[in-house]
């Protein structure tokens, strides 16, 4: 059962994307609660957030606009620090390396705050993700939190049929010195995580459902990037009341 807050954010994301030519609903809805929990409860002014899975931007834009930012409404976010966006996204596997650089700079300069990076499970197939796991573990960055939206679907189909990667990623991260935890990405598990006492970077595997909240989108690959209109749009908005 989604909260009224979660439903409204999804409705607003549909309206915003429709008005600006957007169509990545599945990945936006799978990470909605992660974004809501982070921005409503976890992030402080000292923290930085990177949406590495840029196609999940429509819920992100909704939340940024609620906070008074005015980001450019494109299909993937681009660097606009004055509007709350600290990394261009779209090409997969780039957010974590950038986040490591930010976290290392903060560590070296004794700056407060953490760096949160939200990634997709499909982009965890990228070599840059694996290289980043190794270097972050070696650098011992306790101020780095990487969250994987593990919805099981990428642009061309189910992850399990293309290159199942998450179990190996978790094992590699632990071997490289990360703290690894699994949560339900659609409830408040993220809020219960103690992120202050770890001396290592933290990898959070958030189990989610692609298209969460709209019955005909849930766990259906075509809704990674499908246009919403007509009766289906009406049904989606009705289900999110």
Model-derived features: positions:
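N-terminal capping segment at the start of a domain
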Residues: 4-22, 149-152
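Cofactor-binding active-site loop characterized by glycine-rich and histidine/acidic residues
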Residues: 14-138
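Generic beta-sheet signal
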Residues: 47-49, 113-117, 144, 198-208
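Acidic, glycine-rich active-site loops and adjacent beta-strand->loop/helix elements
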Residues: 54-57, 119-126, 150-154, 186-188, ...
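A short, conserved beta-to-alpha structural element at the edge of catalytic cores
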Residues: 86, 139-165, 169
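Conserved thiamine diphosphate
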Residues: 111, 160-193
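A short alpha/beta connector and helix-capping loop motif
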Residues: 126-151, 201-207
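Glycine/aspartate-rich loop-and-adjacent alpha/beta segment that forms the canonical ThDP
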Residues: 172, 186-241
